[in-house]
Amino acid sequence: MMNWKDFKTGKYAKYTKYLKYYLVVKWTIIVVILIGSGKMYGQNATEIIRKMDEQMQGKSSISEMTMKIVRPTWSREIGIKGWSLGTEYSLILITAPSRDKGSAFLKRDIEMWTWQPSIDRVVKLPPSMMMQSWMGSDFTNDDLVKQSSIVTDFTHQIVADTTLQGYDCYKIELIPKEEAAVVWGRIESYVAKEEYLQLLVKFYDEDDFLVNSMVMSDIREMGGRKIPAVMEMIPADNPEQKTIIEYKSIAFDVPIEEGFFSMQNMKRAR
């Protein structure tokens, strides 16, 4: 019968040496693979988010849409026309109803202004107002102008695979970087694997409570690419209410100059 002394000093000693060497090499390889795959996993998650963002944004765009605010006892609809150039510039014009027609919102880099023709005044919105409701909807000013970038202001990690609306999806967790001016504690993004379509987004506050869920649906080809034509923002604390944005038309990669996004043009945009 073998005992431990045989392995340490007896005829099995040389095999013990080989076994130790084998175990060291084996675990070294495992650790290297795990570390390497972790890095690739993070890189893949960031690339997925980047491709998804490019799919929806393009280099530039001109769009027309409607926004319907739904409440338990009433609803109202707003017509919108929008121009964008990259992630730095955007101009939003209200086209209906008549009482709001002509109101405009301008974003240049991280600054935002609003133009109210009824009072003939341009107002710069301070950062403290970015989380306030936009036009009485469930979208915020930050949602409107995307002051924070889901690509550059967050780290990304694939945390699960799932299925939504018949699409195989990645569930990706976005954690804000320390230096980023981000209002959310974290975000969960559900992205279709093959199409790079974002189908669901969950927004959590700094205490990790769910604040809003945004559901994308009605996938169709618009502007030469496949995108969700409908977005619904649903607050977690008031699930009986929601705001629905539906794209009527959109054109991508259209020629727009930076000079278009000016306070002067905000007043005369049509």
Where on the chain are the PLM-derived regions?
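Short, low-complexity, charge-dense intrinsically disordered segments
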Residues: 5, 10-32
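Hydrophobic core
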Residues: 33-37
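Sec/Tat signal peptide C-region and signal peptidase I cleavage site
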Residues: 38-42
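Flexible, processing/modification-adjacent segments and terminal tails
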Residues: 43-60, 66-68, 75-76, 101-104, ...
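Extended lipid/amphipathic-ligand handling interfaces
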Residues: 52, 80-84, 216-221
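N-terminal, post-signal-peptide region of Sec/Tat-exported proteins
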Residues: 64-99
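Hydrophobic residues embedded in beta-strands of well-ordered beta-sheets
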Residues: 89-90, 112, 122, 198
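Gly/Pro-enriched, hydrophobic low-complexity segments
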Residues: 121, 145, 165-262
